[in-house]
Amino acid sequence: MAPTTKGAKGKTSAKGESKNNKVLGSKVSKKNVKRPPPKEVKSKARTEQSQLKKTKKREYSEAELDLPKLNMITPVGVVNPKGKKKGKTFCDDPEAMMTIFAMVNAEKEGQIESKIMKARQLEEIREAKRKEAEARQSEKKNKLENAKESIRQSRKHKGGASSAKSNKAETESPKPKSGGKKKSVAFA
């Protein structure tokens, strides 16, 4: 409801309000509103001088950037001039470069020497194992030869003393004197 005035005290007039409502709620048609004509914006050709000029970007110094120094090969005392082409020479002092080179070479030679030492040790171990195996084989052969000789000697002693008694004893009692298993040796 609309606020009431002092003179009207509770009475409202329908005519006055309807006029006010008409003015407030009236629509403005968009067809009748005049707009200014659109302005044409011409783009400049890329070959124009103003387009060809490159804006110079600001170059920051290393101190301003405050970047951490990572992946650097250069020694502590050497500072590479900025903008210099990267190459194999990184040091003005050849003595410092040679000392670094010598240190790296010594490290690599140490690794190679350790590999050679390991190879020698392994070869010595293999040689010792080979000698042990040969010694075992020769020991077995000697043992076998001794057994052969003892058997031959026992046969000679039995045959030379009394051949008749031994033949008779072998036919009568084929069992060996010891109660255990009979040992048999076959030679190829």
Swiss-Prot record:
Gene Ontology MF annotations: mRNA binding
Region (Disordered): 1-68, 127-188
Family the UniProt entry places it in: Belongs to the LOC1 family.
Protein name: 60S ribosomal subunit assembly/export protein loc1
GO biological process: intracellular mRNA localization; mRNA transport; ribosomal large subunit biogenesis
Subunit and interaction comment: Component of the 66S pre-ribosomal particle.
Source species of the chain: Emericella nidulans (strain FGSC A4 / ATCC 38163 / CBS 112.46 / NRRL 194 / M139)
Entry-linked InterPro entries: Loc1
Superkingdom to which the source organism belongs: Eukaryota
Alphabetical keyword list: Coiled coil, mRNA transport, Nucleus, Ribosome biogenesis, Transport
Comp. bias (Low complexity): 1-13
UniProt entry tagged with the keyword DNA-binding: no
Ranges of compositional bias, category Basic residues: 178-188
Coiled coil stretches, renumbered: 107-159
Protein's job: Required for efficient assembly and nuclear export of the 60S ribosomal subunit.
Subcellular location: Nucleus, Nucleolus
Key word Nucleotide-binding present: no
Biased composition (Basic and acidic residues): 37-47, 127-152
One CC-aspect GO term: nucleolus
